[in-house]
Amino acid sequence: MSAGEVERLVELSGGTGGDEEEEWLYGGPWDVHVHSDLAKDLDENEVERPEEENASANPPSGIEEEAAENGVAKPKVTETEDDSDSDSDDDEDDVHVTIGDIKTGAPQYGSYGTAPVNLNIKAGGRVYGNTGTKVKGVDLDAPGSINGVPLLEVDLDSFEDKPWRKPGADLSDYFNYGFNEDTWKAYCEKQKRIRMGLEVIPVTSTTNKITVQQGRTGNSEKEAALPSTKAEFTSPPSLFKTGLPPSRRLPGAIDVIGQTITISRVEGRRRANENSNIQVLSDRSATEVDNNFSKPPPFFPPGAPPTHLPPPPFLPPPPTVSTAPPLIPPPGFPPPPGAPPPSLIPTIESGHSSGYDSRSARAFPYGNVAFPHLTSSAPSWPSLVDTTKQWDYYARREKDRDRDRERDRDRERERDRDRERERTRERERERDHSPTPSVFNSDEERYRYREYAERGYERHRASREKEERHRERRHREKEETRHKSSRSNSRRRHESEEGDSHRRHKHKKSKRSKEGKEAGSEPVPEQESTEAAPAE
């Protein structure tokens, strides 16, 4: 089908507009829908490029583009009185139809080099933020929408087909940031409540700043001048963002949806000679500090002490290493020997120690408000730590240990004395039974002395055994006499005394006879020697 046939169709539809049959058949002006297949049949030799450019640059008023529901623009040809009356071929050649599918948001180029048409069709819905400046192309900051409905107002239950519930489906293809169906519903509900004003947002969150300072500060003057903070993310309450793509996200930025918190970071310099300590500082105005500490703030549970508030002023400050009272023994270790230090024992007159309690307590700085200590109700350090009982206990324990040591020493001394006595007795016995060394004149006399010593030892042992036997016998007889019943006590006593005296006399007599025999046997060799001398 050539371009001339198309022009004839347009001419016939315009020239016979008054015919009743054609009006009844075609309904008067009718739309000419030309498909993309006709563009391939156009003869390039019949139509010249300059005419196409003029036609595309100055389109007639009868051609209009209207956007359908699917976003495809359709060319609509309407007849006018001027076109219907003109019969010249030049006027017909000026009409040119551009055929093709136009997609939303992308530049379209005609088949014959016509000017591109860029249609940015946006569905109507709630507009967030400022709408004064219109952005060409796709607005990446605009909230998403599904079929013209804002993303947060879409009801997931309205979908008949839920592909994320199918087996093997990946939830990350349908929900971002780790959401699933249930958490997404809860998130949308919370955002809806925040927009309606039902969700309570803390008022102090607009002025809270969280600053993290790395490195230790040098002195108190430098601590007062904090480095300037860099605000990396600020979410105004009138603007609602669902989050930027990773390519356009600022480094270190945090997206907080529905919150109005300013999060900043302090970049501190690390000194070479100091340790790397991390210090978290909270900036808060002095007017926001509640000076009434009788009750905790309303956002703390009852019974839990607030963590960000300073300690109550009625407690004494904890002792530091430099100001603590000296010589307090740590738990589990005995104190140093000697009397306790006088600073630990409170006197009766004062009731306070002179060293620790006289110093002025430093006030607790918190923001711009300082909390002084109540010195009148603060008890003294010695009254808190009563060490007199501890010292008494330690002194008593030391005395007990000394007594035990003295007893052990006395026992050792008694044992040594007993040993010395035994040794002296043995020496005296040996001296009594042994002759003087001046008697030793010959080997024979030495031999004789040795025999005498041995005999004397045997004699001493035999006499000792006899004494033990007599003692046992007497003991047995005494036991027997006690159990006898036919004699009187006087007679028994008399007989026992007589028996004892008789035994003693007998024992002495036997002892004397033995000694006489030994003495008589010793001078026998001397008599023999004297008898042998005259015989010679």
UniProtKB/Swiss-Prot annotation:
The modification Phosphoserine is found at residues 84, 86, 88, 434, 438, 442, 496. It comes from Rattus norvegicus (Rat). Residues 383-536 are annotated as: Sufficient for interaction with CPSF1 and CSTF3. Residues 136-219 are annotated as: Sufficient for interaction with CPSF4. One of its GO terms (molecular function) is RNA binding. This is Pre-mRNA 3'-end-processing factor FIP1. Component of the cleavage and polyadenylation specificity factor (CPSF) complex that plays a key role in pre-mRNA 3'-end formation, recognizing the AAUAAA signal sequence and interacting with poly(A) polymerase and other factors to bring about cleavage and poly(A) addition. FIP1L1 contributes to poly(A) site recognition and stimulates poly(A) addition. Binds to U-rich RNA sequence elements surrounding the poly(A) site. May act to tether poly(A) polymerase to the CPSF complex. InterPro entries: Fip1_dom (IPR007854), Pre-mRNA_3'-end_processing_reg (IPR051187).
